[in-house]
């Protein structure tokens, strides 16, 4: 992986000048580290109550990790067609849900035992399509700012580049994820 000053500056510019975040993503050496960096950035920027890092594994979504005020779904798998992270990956679009009770994409039964009332999920992936997602969650109905909704896809792109650079040898539980990220273009 090449962490040239020019590359870091380019990524930092796309992340509203956040050189520290760009440097951390460019320096990451494992998928777990990339997930930790991305989750921390989202939680800090969006001031949300929880963040998940989700990987696509064939027709399943694997909730690889989370940083949350209460447990959500870390370590669990769900059919890709039955969760919002899966919807974001399948459609390659940001899922913005101000009120989970009012959005048909939300499998409300999965949320009844959680604090989640609002969420935003951004897909992460290369040209072959998204193979990961980051979800941000709030305990009340919430509308994310336009600036934050514009920033999330840029973070997803930088995260995708970091994943492409490190490879996925440390992700044996997600064999289909491994082939989804070609070498980084940045």
Predicted regions and their residues:
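Signal-transmission linkers at sensory-effector interfaces
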Residues: 1-32, 44, 162-186
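GAF sensory/regulatory domain recognition
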Residues: 39-43, 50-76
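Signal-transducing coupling segments at domain and membrane junctions
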Residues: 62, 70-73, 98-118, 138, ...
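Short beta-strand-to-loop transition segments that serve as allosteric relay/switch motifs
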Residues: 69, 133-143
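Acidic/proline- and glycine-rich, intrinsically disordered low-complexity segments
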Residues: 72-94
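A short, aliphatic-rich beta-strand micro-motif
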Residues: 117-126
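Flexible loop/coil segments at beta-strand boundaries within sensory signal-transduction domains
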Residues: 125-130, 139, 166
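Amphipathic alpha-helical "output/dimerization" segments
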Residues: 144-164, 176-178
């Amino acid at each position: 992986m090449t962490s040239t000053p020019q590359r870091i500056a380019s990524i930092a510019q796309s992340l509203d000048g956040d050189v520290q975040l760009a440097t951390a993503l460019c320096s990451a050496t494992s998928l777990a580290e990339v997930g930790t960096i991305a989750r921390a950035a989202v939680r800090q920027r969006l001031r949300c109550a929880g963040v998940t890092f989700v990987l696509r594994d064939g027709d399943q979504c694997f909730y690889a990790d989370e940083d949350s005020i209460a447990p959500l779904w870390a370590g669990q798998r769900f059919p890709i067609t039955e969760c919002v992270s899966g919807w974001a990956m399948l459609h390659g679009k940001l899922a913005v849900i101000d009120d989970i009770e009012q959005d048909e994409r939300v499998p409300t039964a999965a949320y009844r035992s959680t604090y989640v009332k609002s969420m935003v999920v951004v897909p992460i992936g290369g040209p072959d399509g998204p193979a990961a997602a980051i979800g941000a969650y709030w305990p009340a109905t919430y509308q994310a700012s336009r600036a934050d909704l514009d920033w999330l896809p840029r973070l997803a792109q930088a995260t995708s580049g970091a994943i492409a650079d490190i490879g996925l040898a440390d992700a044996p539980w997600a064999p289909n994820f491994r082939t989804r990220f070609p070498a980084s273009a940045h």
